Amino acid sequence: MGLFDKKYCDICGEKIGLLGNRKLENGNLCKNCAKKLSPWFSDRRNSTVDEIKAQLAYREENQGKVAAFHTTRTLGTDTKVLFDEDAGKFMVTRARNLVEANPDVLDFADVTGCNLDIDERRSELEREDEDGNKISYNPPRYEYSYDFYITIFVNNPYFDEMRFKINSDSVDVTPPPAMRPGMATRYDPESNVEYRNCKKLGEEIRQMLTQVRKDVRERIEQAAAPKAAITCPYCCATTTPDASGRCEYCGGALNG
């Protein structure tokens, strides 16, 4: 086929415009269908048509989960982590219209880890000498820029991590000059209020996700643990409590 031959989307069958093709491993995808994929998905070019169809079915099912989602806690300012603690689910999004954005709804049990990373960049400050040339300070002075990133590692068939920036704008810090010329001083970014606030938010998100994962794992382990046989106080039978904590013979409530 020629470069400018007509192409059709292998998902919806619609004609693809000149700049609208999104290549798949064995086919073509239009930009409208591509928009429906998960925002955390990044392996489109290596995906087959059938794999994309399966993901779009998953995304359509996700719309029902978004509709049923009841936010009980929100962490974040720009990109937010929304929790439905009653249902044991969460989502990450910066969208205001959740129905339109259709952010992936995940179970607490899907979380496998969570990291907070602080990206530091520095650039040297210079001054002009008597001849107008830019020269370094003695000792050299720098200004710093910080960005704060959360990475949530998850079990999901279409992506294994969700990485996003906490702060909408970089935190820029210019330390004061040294008290004595020629003597270097150490600067602690923790003395900057904005830096501290961003780090605190990141730690809160990380701790929350780490805790809910721990709670889920503990419940799974408890459910899998063998239950000890006890004597029912009502029928005197030796019984193992059922899922409701009742005697398997007479149905009496057991405290053991």
Where are the regions that the model predicts?
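Residues immediately within or flanking Cys/His clusters that coordinate Zn2+
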Residues: 4-9, 27, 229, 244
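Short cysteine-rich clusters marking metal-coordination/redox-active sites
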Residues: 9-12, 30-33, 232-235, 247-250
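Short Cys/His-rich micro-motifs in 6-15 aa windows
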Residues: 27-43, 250-256
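Short linker/helix segments within small regulatory modules
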Residues: 19-28, 240-246
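Short, non-ligating residues that shape and space the ligands of small metal-coordination modules
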Residues: 18-19, 39-40, 241-242, 256
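Anionic N-terminal interaction surfaces
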Residues: 37-104
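Phosphoinositide-binding peripheral membrane targeting modules
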Residues: 87-135
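Acidic, Ser/Thr- and proline-rich intrinsically disordered linker/docking segments
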Residues: 114-226
